[in-house]
Amino acid sequence: MKKTFLFLMLLPTMAFAQSGTNSPYSQYGLGLLSDQSTGFNRAMGGVAQGMHESNQINHQNPASYSNVDSLTFLFDVGAALQITNFKEGNRKLNANNSNFEYVTMSFRVAPRFGMSAGIIPISNIGYDYYTTNKVSEGSTTSYTTQYNGSGGTRVMYIGAGWQPIKNFSIGANIGYLWGSYNRNVVNSYTDENANTIGRYYSAEINSYKFDVGAQYTFKLNSKNNITLGATYSLGHDLGGSATLQEISNSLNTSDTITVTHDKAISIPHSYSVGLAWYHTKKIRLGADYTLQQWSTCKFPDLTSKGYEVTKSAYQDRHKVAFGGEFVNNVNSRRYLDRVHVRAGASYTTPYLKINGQDGPKEISATIGLGLPISNSWNNRSMLNISAQWAQNNAKGMIRENTFRINIGITFNERWFQKWKVE
């Protein structure tokens, strides 16, 4: 029987989760793909390709590390709080979620050469719901299908950026990618003579991730310049294995079938291009485009032929983002003059196919502030805070509206400064 995507009720256990998501859409593929931007560019819709800040970390384009300020050590940590409204027909439900998201650091090693390291989320899985249906029209026997899952993937990276010639920078990240997921589907019947069937999907992922990037800055005049940026992420098979365990229980018997596939999951080749316009130190505007070739990736799935590795669950993913910021005067004595005001938006097509239909598209809008942290020993650190609205929607499926508060703190320390003793 074709699996119904409709839910009757999300369980109370979803009310406050730590997995980074509580979306039923995360039961497919690698789950919901994470927003990998950090605090400052997340408030600008996630634009990153042309951004090269001396006091913020932009790991999405490693070429930007070459612009890290000398004598500076940057440390950035972020978290998010969100509430999601799920709507299907006349049924509505709110669910809360919080998540520690990323930690990164960056510093200059030599003139025109910087490095960065950190841990960044790639995908998240977290859901728990059930459906109830009649076995057939007019039947008194009904069955309940319970769906629940958890997991996700992360990458721990180290990268370097170098400016070999004036205005041109290159960089690379290499990282250890790891994660796991557990997805369970259990059918139970009101007729005690009917079999209870449980399917338990699991996977362990251990692999690598590799990205390269470049940036070139055109000096238009003394007040304006434009930076073009581009990155490429290598697509490849992931190490580890995926397993399906099917257990059928009746009053008198229990049968178990286990199927395992090695290297059954892959990640896509990804290409990003973008530009950023800088006007003095007051205005930054940027726009990015990203293509992820998920249609070439494989994933284990239960089909009419059994549990097999297929490429039918995915399609190419496209994302467009734009945003910017304004700061009146970064050197002013007045605090409000040094506050960064940011805004941005993005549109993303789905990488998933659900029962042969396109998964949910996402539209998102964000506003935020960069608040300087000033005290007697440090006036360079910054609190990056933003409010984000996002909608995931697909025809005939659940609509999700999410309101998210993103919080990031960038600590900016002058670790390598030589102090004079009088």
Predicted segments, located by residue:
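Bacterial Sec-dependent N-terminal signal peptides
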Residues: 1-22, 422
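Subset of outer-membrane beta-barrel
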Residues: 18-422
